Amino acid sequence: MFFTTGLVTDKGTVKEINQDAMMLKVAMTKEHGRIAFGLVCDGCGGLSFGEIASASYVRRMEDWFYNELPGILTNEDDTRKLDESSDNRYDPIELIKGNWTYISTQMNERLMEYGIQKRASVGTTVCMIIIIGREYLAMNIGDSRIYKYTNKKVSCITHDHSYVQKQMDEGRMTLKEAQISPMKSVLLQCIGAVGALDPYFSRGIIGRDESFLLCCDGFWRKTTPNDMVRIMNVSGYDKNSDLSSGKDLDNKIESVLKDHIEKLKYEGEKDNISAILIRARDAI
């Protein structure tokens, strides 16, 4: 796959500290060609504790990307060949899912201990995605989201862990009611603030040309469906342009994200605002 990407973060108009943290990696592998990995964390908690939580999770996942993922991709730790009952089908995506669950549980415990020491509530949401070959794996905890753009349509491939989402799932609240509810910011899952995590996973096949947008609630809350299509469509490839390096398109993506963030601030969004856009397409 060939990737064009952009990422932008802004502390917003009110908060003195940007409690969001994010990371984007694109790497060439021997076994799977180019892969892409991105995550957005939205820290919550008083003072700088939210910033600590989100940054700590991103650092842990950066360590995983460099030191643990290579072993999964090269299949060097696979022992199923010693098991005659095994069907010998190696599935790196499923192993990554297990890794992410374990790491999130580990970080949840560490941040809870830190919060106890500081006598404060410490936590962070997360949404992240990895693209390997023609497959993707997405995960979220909290209300940071991932949107997919394909065939000129946008869909959300994550599921909020929030009070209002649970009410909607159970048929007790409509979308319009959720959007104006005083409980709309209450989270039911957050790394560092719950006893047991229940990450939401989404796995799928990528077509010839698809885009993924990772964002915190400060980005998606006031973004309309038409805005989302406009933003994600900007990653479309123009055959008449010389963008073989992808650098011009990367800059264009970041410019559109920045412009939209300014629009959100003008419309009254006060939270930190962060987003990553990844376009995956067949190499030309």
At which residue positions do the language-model features occur?
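PP2C/PPM-type serine/threonine phosphatase catalytic domain
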Residues: 1-284
